[in-house]
């Protein structure tokens, strides 16, 4: 069961995301349900650590098993979703991942994979293109250039 709560006042999610980079590009994804780019990842399950969750999500979405280098951010975000129009309070831990010992780069600059009944479209986006793309999280458009050396807590309100 995912750590996710819904009530009349909005939604709460506890999520993880994988930051995977190669030569000033970041791996982003989207699907037909979401018009914007986002990072691979998903909700943490009850009883699961954030580290276990990010590995599980990347395995499910990309069929690879990367290594975690380190956590980068805990981002507290408050927003209204562009797709469902609902209010969200979300905690997301972003992990920098090592993809060296995977076949991820051999998949090409754009590729699609299926996860169950869902098709995910992936693309290696150049850092400088992020500012012009419909991409979440917004803070990453600037902070991708200077990843924190220590775990950082941040808050984002839209």
Task: Put a short name on every predicted segment.
Residues 24-26, 34, 45, 74-79, ...:
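Short, charged/polar surface micro-motifs in flexible loops or helix N-caps
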Residues 35-37, 103-158:
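Nudix hydrolase/Nudix homology domain
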């Amino acid at each position: 069961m995912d750590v996710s709560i819904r009530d009349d006042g909005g939604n709460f999610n506890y999520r993880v995301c994988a930051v995977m980079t190669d030569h000033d590009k970041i791996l982003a994804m989207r699907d037909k349900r979401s018009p914007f780019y986002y990072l691979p990842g998903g909700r943490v399950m009850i009883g699961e650590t954030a580290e276990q969750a990010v590995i599980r999500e990347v395995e499910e979405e990309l069929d690879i098993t990367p290594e975690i280098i380190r956590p980068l951010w805990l981002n507290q975000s408050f927003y209204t979703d562009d797709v469902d129009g609902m209010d969200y309070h979300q905690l997301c831990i972003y992990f920098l991942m090592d993809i060296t010992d995977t076949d991820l780069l051999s998949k090409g600059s754009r590729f699609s994979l299926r996860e169950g009944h869902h098709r995910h479209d992936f693309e290696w986006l150049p850092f400088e293109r992020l500012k012009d793309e419909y991409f979440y999280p917004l803070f990453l458009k600037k902070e991708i250039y200077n990843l924190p050396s220590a775990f950082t807590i941040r808050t984002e309100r839209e």
